[in-house]
Regions:
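Flexible, compositionally biased loop and terminal segments
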Residues: 1-254
């Protein structure tokens, strides 16, 4: 009586990438709120209120545009120098956004994370941040990162301080250290497309390390007027560009 032995091969199947992992990383400098309000004879605070409403629309539109990670520049470290009344309003608006949008993010499978310093943020806002991050931590459709009290130069300095004791430092070491100081525990990803609204053409100390090879897209449209169609147009132009990452075009190389 013969026995046939079958060898079972075990193959390792890599888990499929989530939409958040496979989509492009878009960063937006949301500029022009104050000028939008001034053009209408209204206080600057009215522009910030109008701009906050746009954030929801852009976040909802992002996954359908093929965006997996969206980083929004909400409040820079330099913005503390603005009038105290304006700063206080921005902090209230941000907390109101977190309270109002956390459940929506859970429903829409969006993970929300706040990057930047946390030692100068009001305690009530800090509590809301922790609640929002914990509630949305399982989101896989979109990684939404909101930069508050953020400075890229400051992040670089603090990351270097963390690595000071190491004998040698690689690019990956620095990237991971910057993620740590910015309270981001996800994948350290470069920016694919940087959008700036409001007509200015500068980076304003935003994601300087991550934007090393980013495509830049500037629009005169002020943030309160920015629409999901504008976002789609920016992404469409991004996909039409040839990204070389320091190399030469294929035609020239051949």
């Amino acid at each position: 009586m013969s026995h046939t032995h079958h060898t079972v091969k075990h193959t390792h199947v890599r888990p499929a990438m989530t939409p958040a992992q496979s989509g492009i990383h878009v960063a937006i400098i949301m500029d022009g709120n104050g000028r939008w309000a001034n053009a209408r004879g209204r206080p600057r605070t009215a522009g910030h209120i109008a701009g906050a409403r746009v954030v929801r629309k852009i976040v909802e539109a992002a996954p359908d545009c093929g965006i997996g990670m969206l980083t929004l520049y909400a409040f820079s470290a330099d913005n503390w120098a603005r009038p105290s009344r304006e700063v206080a309003l921005l902090m209230r608006l941000f907390r109101r956004y977190l309270v109002a949008e956390t459940d929506r993010c859970v429903t829409n499978n969006v993970r929300m994370r706040i990057i930047g310093r946390r030692d100068r943020i009001p305690s009530e806002l800090l509590r809301s941040i922790k609640v929002a991050e914990e509630a949305t931590r399982h989101g896989t459709r979109l990684d939404l990162r909101i930069a508050v009290d953020y400075s890229s130069r400051d992040a670089l300095v603090r990351a270097a301080e963390r690595l000071n004791a190491q004998q040698s430092v690689t690019r990956d070491d620095l990237s991971h250290a910057m993620c740590k100081v910015d309270h981001w525990d996800g994948e350290c990803r470069d920016v694919d497309l940087l959008i700036r609204t409001g007509g200015e053409q500068r980076l304003s100390d935003f994601l300087l390390w991550e934007c090393a090879y980013a495509e830049l897209y500037f629009t005169d449209r002020r943030w309160p007027d920015f629409t999901s169609a504008d976002l789609g147009a920016a992404v469409k132009e991004f996909h039409s560009r040839e990204r070389r990452f320091g190399t030469v075009p294929e035609a020239a190389a051949g």
